[in-house]
Every structure is written in structure tokens, then in C-alpha cells.
Amino acid sequence: MQNNTLSRPGFSLSGTALKRLACLSMLLDHIGASLLENGLFKQGAFWPGDVQLDGVLRLVGRLAFPIYCFLLVEGFLHTHDFKKYALRMLGFALISEWPFDWAFFSGVYWGHQNVYFTLLLGLLAMKALDTYQTPEGMPALKGILGAAACFLAAALLHCDYDVLGLALILALYMTRKDKRAQCIAGAVFSLFEPVAPLAFGLVWFYSGERGGSSKLEQWAFYWFYPAHIFVLGVLANLVLFR
């Protein structure tokens, strides 16, 4: 497993910096989706400006998922323990599901699963393609079938971003050896969301370095997703819009 990270003079972003930006973008997106769309708008008591605010929040929030997909590919390429990485993703997918349903659907909802499931399936699809290769280094039939099974699972589970999310992850993985091609592929495969291709303007400045972060912050990045949607669920369902 290898990738191509270019050393860029001047301005650059570490992996930690990209994670922080993605967290901020995701938070703004979910404020719009939970507090406004699943809260205020359902009450019918809102001003036209609230709709415009929601639009701005959701547009800024479109930057988060492509960045997380890129970081997932980087994580896959550099992990020393794939099994532990995958189990961590599964654990947080399970932890996040009820807060996800509560924040965005006000109760248990089986028709849409949280983004950790999407990332987990993307991780498994990359593993299949990496494990089963032809002598020329191309994906072998077993690898393709394994990736196809992940696409089927994403469709059946109705994961966040669905099969398009998986396609974006694999596009970034397949172009990992050429940063220019990777950013172009990422922009093209994220066209299903407005503004999302702009995320690769940030990815372009990725330094290839993990960046300074404590062990606590590294775990905080994982916990941020279930924690913030739980808080939004409390605000939307118990505090602001009872």
C-alpha cells in the first residue's frame, strides 16, 4: 500500500488540520439538519432568513464528507493494524446510530444509517481491492467482487451518502499515487453534492504529515461525531422544540 504525497512550499495542511476543518464543517451542517430542518422548520415557526441560514450551513457542511473520505484513504494506507482500525469504525458506527436517528429523525429510523457505516464499508472495499490483485497490480476478480459486496451492503443498509459515498472513497483510493489525479477524481465523484468538490482545494494543500495532536485529541476526533449529534438531539427534541 502506498500513496503519493507532494511536499508543498508555503501554505500546507496537516492531517490534523484537515480533521479540525472537517469537524467544524460537519458541525455547521448538522446544526442546520437537526436544529433547523428537524426542529424549527417542523414547528412551522420560522422566518425566511432561517431558510437562508439553513442553506448556508448545509452548503458549508458539504465540505466535510469528501475530507473524511480522503483521510480514510490515508488512514488505510498508513495503518499498522487494519483489523483494529476496522473494529474501531464498527464500534463507533454502532455507538452513533441511536444519536443519529434521534438528532435527525426524532426517533429510531431504520431507513438511513450513519456515516460511520459508510466509512467502514469503504475501508472494507479498499481492503478487498488491496488484498486481491493481479501480478500487474490491478484489482483481481475476488477484489472487485468484495468491493461490489460493500456497495450492495451500502445500498441495502441505506448508509449516509449511499453508494455514491463508496464510489468517492474508491476513486480516491485508486488515484492515490498521483495527487493531481486524486483531487480531480475526488472533485468529479463528489459532484453529487453542491460545493463538495471545493473540499479538494483544501486536500491539495495536504502536507502528507499527520500533524501534532495528543492521544486525547486523536480519540476526540472519533468521539466528536456521536457526541455532537447527541447534544443536537437533546436540543432539538428536549429543550428547544418540545
Regions found by a protein language model. Name each.
Residues M1-R242:
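Alpha-helical transmembrane segments and their immediate juxtamembrane cytosolic regions
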